[in-house]
Amino acid sequence: MEGPLELTGLSRRFGSLVALDDLSFTVARGRVTGFLGPNGAGKTTTMRAIFGLTQLDGGTVRWNGAAVAPADRRRFGYMPEERGLYPGMLVGDQVRYLGRLHGLSDHEATVAAVHWLERLDVADRLSSKVESLSHGNQQRVQLAAALVHDPELLVLDEPMAGLDPTGVDAIGEVLTEQARAGRCVLFSSHQLDLVEDLCEVVVIIDHGRVLVSGEVGELESGGAPRLSVRVEGDRDGTWARELSGVEVSEVKGGAVRLVLRPGVDSDVVLDAARRAGRVLEFAFARRRLSEVFREAVRG
């Protein structure tokens, strides 16, 4: 998959710790790309490398086919996991100031700051100090600061961490809008159901290496056959756990999700379900992103 942001062969060590190990992937325009991995997988180091905030031992970061230059980074927007707002500064002044740092005139920065604070439902806190805001509203202001200069690339490290559903929806809508407007959007999250809803593409890494990348739909349609089975009166899938070559991947709301190993016939599973009780549901199912993630990380 090609895109204007290309990371090729990135490597970085911190003493004996290998943070990035020949990591390569691209981020396309017009799509939201989810960047996934366990804690310590190398996601934050990768994002910092895009902005030149960590020195690489090897590899290249390219934008539109050329090495990223300082002028390019002025067209990038970054929301780091460790939030970078000044606690004692007024919200409006903070966002406007960051717009000026990215080359906007004072008037342009003021107009853009008001626009994004309104869009993210925090315009009423324009004259409040950042430190007086709730965690969720600080997240919204941080996103406004990343968007104030209308960036071509938006990189967000755990932007929805700790947010309530309203905050998640608000930020998710903005990311989708940015992608539809032709921007590149890359964001990391441990909330896999959220990534599944928002993203068309995912990159899964661990130990600084890419394990899996591609279209969410294609990844979910691959892998071993899966069944969703609901048996009247069954709450824990005990009947399925006794079947050879069948793995119970999830039990939720009375439905049992099963993974069939090679050579296992679904009719065998159906017969076992019928012996356990009245079968209310028996259907083939796609992999969920959470299953793709677990299988990739488990190896």
Task: Give residue ranges: language-model regions.
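ABC transporter nucleotide-binding domains
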Residues: 2-5, 12-206, 212
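Solvent-exposed beta-strand sheet faces enriched in polar/charged residues
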Residues: 8, 230, 283-285
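Short, flexible helix/strand-to-coil boundary loops that buttress conserved ligand/catalytic motifs
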Residues: 72, 220-223, 293
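Short coil/loop linkers at secondary-structure junctions
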Residues: 105, 123, 246-247, 279
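ABC transporter nucleotide-binding domain
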Residues: 170-260
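C-terminal coupling/interaction segments
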Residues: 261-299
